[in-house]
Amino acid sequence: MSNTNYVILTVASVDFSYRETMARLMSSYSKDLIDNAGAKGTRFGSIGTGDHAGSLIFIQFYDDLTGYQKALEIQSKSSVFKEIMDSGKANIYLRNISTSLPTKFEQSSEHPKYIVLTRAEAAMSDKDKFLNCINDTAFCFKDNGALTLRFGNLLTGSNVGNYLLGVGYPSMEAIEKTYDQLLAHSSYKELMTFAKVNMRNIIKIL
């Protein structure tokens, strides 16, 4: 998937017995968004760690927010979305919009099996410095198997202004190797002097 400018993240609690059905329905819903709202891609997965462990997350990628506006119009008329909501087994409790800034990371077209979402607090005046650190360490992600990387700022929610890094991986082993190398990198150490990580979750793509 190519670079995009906006990422939409929606989190829901879902009855375990309904997950297989919801995964099937979300596949159909995703196709509708790509075909008719201009979504550049979607991801659907289960959050395995952190405060939202056990919840499901739906991630959408857009070039502009006009696409997301179209997505909301489709949502209001979608029989698939209505079926999910009418089931009484899924409850959306979080939806945030994040920017996605250009980075030096070359995106792969291969679909990841895992995504690591990291949220950090830092001053807006440190945005360029933060982005430089991400670009300086981009090879650490790529060399250890990372497939996709998105970095930006949250525009909505209780953590507005926080920075969000989402990285897609083919395996848990690739995640482990990446962080082993990152911890020893000077730019990562610099990053930790002005940014405070307040969330890191691992998502398994369904």
Residue ranges of model-derived segments:
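Short S/T/G/P-rich N-terminal loop/turn motif that feeds into the first structured element of a domain
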Residues: 1-206
